Design a protein with these regions (language model features):
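C-terminal, low-ordered peptide segments at domain boundaries
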Residues: 88-109, 114, 226, 306-317
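A conserved glycine-rich beta-strand in the N-terminal activation segment of trypsin-fold
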Residues: 14-46, 68-73, 103-105, 131, ...
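Active-site loop architecture of trypsin-fold serine endopeptidases
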Residues: 28-29, 57-60, 93-101, 121-134, ...
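Catalytic-histidine neighborhood of serine endopeptidases
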Residues: 42-83, 89-91, 100
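Short glycine/Trp-rich loop-beta-loop segment that forms part of the substrate-binding cleft
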Residues: 68, 106-128
Length: 317
């Protein structure tokens, strides 16, 4: 497709030698990925891809539909959302190449339904553009990070190494997602032994982020309530006769929580209208907020021998 590119990333990797007197050795590692041409400015062509495709690279090379290779630079990225925008100078692209490439047509991922037909396009295994087809297997699948989770589109189209950053298209040929991960039997998104479980980032969820990154702006850093603690799951709840939710074990001094009516021992069950079933429900919600915003926390607190409920407003920092 004229709007899809192949990406080759080069990274310096350091490894220790078997012989201690030689010391650490550096070598160049080459990775493959894909990207989607989303817009063109007066001086640059902008391409969206996964952040992990271009993370810590010393050189990024973009290959267009006519196999013309051009260097690119990172315009902006969000590690948390695994999204990056890279830029190619128009002055570096031949006129013949500019004549054949196209901007991707963007669709609305919120209109997707389970069972809808989809097309996945990417640079599978670094061999160049390839196309696979399938259906939407599930929506809003939570893929866990270290301290956060992202809601993903699950698909059964084949997703292999190098497909990351490529386009997920609906039946109209519109981009509705960015192919991002394939899960294997050990739970990683590396080589596959489980088939039919690919994942893509819903495009409508990251439209505003991509617009900001395209301008060279920093990704949102989110905001903080000023609490720490641990989750009370169903098992713990039954064992100790406590409500499920996030148990506050510490309140940071001079934080928004410290200046509110929150107390240690409170159990947060909702943040605004979001049910708190895991800590990621809180951290993901706060990621979209900024300092000065207010949130309402529904909390359970012990009163005598029973728990009562109250709503506390907290100003974020």
């Amino acid at each position: 497709m004229p709007s899809i590119v192949s990406i080759t990333s080069k990274t310096l990797v350091q490894s220790n030698s078997y012989f201690p007197w030689i010391g650490p050795q550096e070598y160049e590692s080459v990775g493959a990925g894909s990207g989607i041409i989303i817009s063109k400015t007066k001086s640059e062509l902008l391409i969206v891809t996964n952040y992990h495709v271009v993370e810590d690279t010393k050189e990024i090379v973009v290959s267009f539909i006519d196999e013309e290779n051009v260097n690119a630079t990172i315009k902006g990225f969000s590690e948390r959302k695994d999204v990056a925008v890279i830029a190619v100078k128009l002055s570096d692209i031949k006129k013949e190449t500019l004549d054949v490439i196209r901007m991707a047509t963007l669709g609305n991922s919120k209109e997707l339904k389970v069972g809808n037909g989809i097309i996945a396009i990417g640079n599978a295994l670094g061999y160049g553009q390839s196309v696979t087809v399938g259906v939407v297997s599930a929506l809003d699948r939570k893929i866990e990070g270290d301290t956060y989770s992202n809601n993903m589109i699950q698909l059964d189209a084949a997703i292999n190494g190098g497909n990351s950053g490529g386009a997920l298209l609906n039946s109209k040929g519109e981009v509705v997602g960015i192919n991002s991960a394939k899960y294997s039997s050990n739970g990683s998104s590396s080589s596959a032994s489980i088939e039919g479980m690919g994942f893509a980032i819903p495009f409508s969820d990251i439209t505003d982020l991509i617009e900001s990154l395209s301008k060279g702006e920093e990704a949102p850093k989110g905001a903080s309530i000023g609490i720490s603690g641990y989750m009370i799951d169903e098992s713990t709840s039954k064992s100790y006769n406590m409500p499920t939710g996030f148990y506050i074990s510490e309140i940071v001094k001079d934080s928004g929580a410290d200046k509110s009516e929150l107390d240690i021992g409170n159990i947060v069950t909702k943040i605004d209208d979001i049910e708190v079933e895991e800590f990621n429900d809180i951290s993901n919600y706060l990621y979209e907020k900024k300092a000065g915003d207010k949130v309402k926390l529904t909390v359970k607190y012990i009163s005598g021998r029973q728990y009562k409920e109250k709503v506390v407003t907290v100003t974020l920092q």
